[in-house]
Amino acid sequence: MSGVSSGEVLKILRERIENFGGPVKAGSVGEVLSVKDGIAVVYGLHGAGFGETVAFASGVRGVISGLESDIASVVIFGEDREVKEGDSVECTGELMKVPVGFSLLGRVVSPLGMPLDGEGAISGCDGENPVEVKAPGIMARQPVSEPLQTGIKTIDMLIPIGRGQRELIIGDRKTGKTAIALDTIINQKRYNDRAASEKDKVYCIYVAIGQKNSSIARVVSKLCEAGAADYTIVVATGASDSVPLQYLAPYAACAMGEFFRDNGMHCLIVYDDLSKHAVAYRQMSLLLRRPPGREAYPGDVFYIHSRLLERAAKLSDALGGGSLTALPIIETQAGDVSAYIPTNVISITDGQIFLESELFHKGFRPAINVGLSVSRVGSAAQVKAVKKVAGSMKLSLAQYRELEDFARFGSDLDASSQAMLEKGRRMIELLKQGQYSPLSVEEQVAVMLAGSDSCIDAIPVGDMCRFERGLLEKLRIDHGDLMACLLEDDVRSKLLEVIRGFAVSF
């Protein structure tokens, strides 16, 4: 066998090297040292950045949430049992992104954009948005000027919400917080059905953070029944999902909502609820060995909510005039709104709707305490017809609450005070409203106009709900034309004639 000379070997190697045309990929690769409770400790990710997405050998993704000289702490978004000690980890060079677009409407997805409803893969997305982005600046915004109708009389009349506002829904468990958010989503159907273009519609996102799977299923079922699923995205994380996924959920959903906002459309997002989100972040921070502060929350727990809620905005006309309205939900313990997380979120938002368990158990639903609830910017978005009625309502209810305190102690009241007390009781009855029965603005104005008029003084307090149902039925059947022009034209006197006529015949 003849030997091969070294010159020939060098020649062959030189030819191979010169003809090599394959792509060369340079990257930072590390090795998993340990995995525990959704946190992986990785060695060797040189040049990696804080918040950068990494890919494990199993395909699971994670985000770098802690950096030391040679060690990185990675939060795993998925099942940590799929990540093993010794697995390779590769930096992607990108921040966390989620799919966005119209194809997500009507679907139930995870915070990573994966379908959870069993209806197959999601195709035709309009791209991807980063989960963490800077909130719009001062010059990128404009004042809230358009109303967002909830269909709930107490809110639309007394605590109005505008497009681009952040309105907190706060109260004890089982007081109807989610019910208010769902009614608001369902009420958008009447406006979306008659919208002239896509830019006139209000798209909705419901974010379930650490909720029971049965509760999420009930919400999805109700949205489908009401025909609201077509314009709604449900981003779901159950109580059994990993803590990092629960933490990621509101940011991912906000990125999906920003697609509509940045394209000149309107979006409503419900965070249900941020109390569980704060607990998930506390758990994650303790696992990352960050120093605990008050109630064992880390020092930046305020910042995680402020940077999320500041992304809700009404953009300037130069940027398309789109809006993202946020309805965060906070659960209190025994009505204590002075606790750490509630006070944080109250200070970030533009107002709060406060629900009381005492009112709920008395049968006043929605159980909104009008005295403690406030909307700091929404009144600028109210239409004229609503403002006229709402102004007198606020005064009547304030006088009623003051007189009620006197009456409770058995104080003698004169005839005018007694009449005011009776009027307040009737007004309170008219503010009651069943769940999943939102009213149009015209219907709300008609009911509240009746409540402020003396024509109802002869009707017993217990019959006010029946009176309201009868009045609305009559207006829908016999006076549809009057209702249609109620907001544009001054037809208040004509409407009062109809109301007084019905009150006499009731």
Curated annotation (Swiss-Prot):
Role of this protein: Produces ATP from ADP in the presence of a proton gradient across the membrane. The alpha chain is a regulatory subunit.
Compartments where found: Cell inner membrane
Keyword Transport included in the entry's annotation: yes
Enzyme class: translocase
Claim: Transport is one of the keywords in the record: yes
Organism: Anaplasma phagocytophilum (strain HZ)
Alphabetized UniProt keyword annotations: ATP synthesis, ATP-binding, Cell inner membrane, Cell membrane, CF(1), Hydrogen ion transport, Ion transport, Membrane, Nucleotide-binding, Translocase, Transport
Sites where the protein binds ATP: 171-178
A Gene Ontology cellular-component term: proton-transporting ATP synthase complex
Subunit text: F-type ATPases have 2 components, CF(1) - the catalytic core - and CF(0) - the membrane proton channel. CF(1) has five subunits: alpha(3), beta(3), gamma(1), delta(1), epsilon(1). CF(0) has three main subunits: a(1), b(2) and c(9-12). The alpha and beta chains form an alternating ring which encloses part of the gamma chain. CF(1) is attached to CF(0) by a central stalk formed by the gamma and epsilon chains, while a peripheral stalk is formed by the delta and b chains.
EC number: 7.1.2.2
Family statement drawn from the similarity comment of this UniProt entry: Belongs to the ATPase alpha/beta chains family.
Name used for this protein in its record: ATP synthase subunit alpha
One Pfam family, short name: ATP-synt_ab
Catalytic activity: ATP + H2O + 4 H(+)(in) = ADP + phosphate + 5 H(+)(out)
Topology term for the membrane: Peripheral membrane protein
